[in-house]
Amino acid sequence: RQRQMCIRDSHMVMSKKVSPHVTNVVEVDVTRLVHWREKNKDAFFRREGVKLTYMPVITEAVAKALAAYPQVNVSVDGYNILFKKHINIGIAVSLNDGNLIVPVIHDADRLNLNGLALSINSLALKARNNKLTPDEISGGTFTITNYGTFKMLFGTPVINQPEVAILGVGSIEKKPVVKETPEGDVIAIRHKMYLSLSYDHRVVDGSLGGNFLHFIADYLERFTSE
């Protein structure tokens, strides 16, 4: 365990030294997504045998954002920027011994929500049972880390080198929000979540990072499974 933690820590230190990190944060209204999950989770479990979480939808949003902004789906090799032909999304999984591993969903943009849900569940189970193959932990082009699992609102995640960006997902909380109506402003209870995007400022500027993050936020706020 000591050896594994040293390797992970040195990788994170290297990332901070190599990449000038910038982190943007946006608050997202996911009320529609929460209602969709509540409506469909029981039927999904009966049909697929796995729990329906928010991660498949978030992963789908990221895959679509990477397709729309291919400048983020890159890696850095010395002074060269390498554009990736495939969208391979790594999802950080916390292990029982306190360590972390990032299994990768290859060609995530080619999977529908069912496929993403099954892939995420399968990779997480393999990770916790030490059954991942080398291919399942390599080739990632972007990473998602979900610290909302630990009731954290938001954070500033460290980029998984040699990628150039990482998305952090916070917990979903109910909040009172002012909503505009034809009759005037009213107070409504909405489900809110923070997303934080850390990116390598050598490659991704503020405009690109902001547009990429807002693409994901807008997709989640307007989510429909149809």
Describe each PLM feature range.
Residues 1-4, 9-226:
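C-terminal catalytic/motor cores of large multi-domain enzyme assemblies
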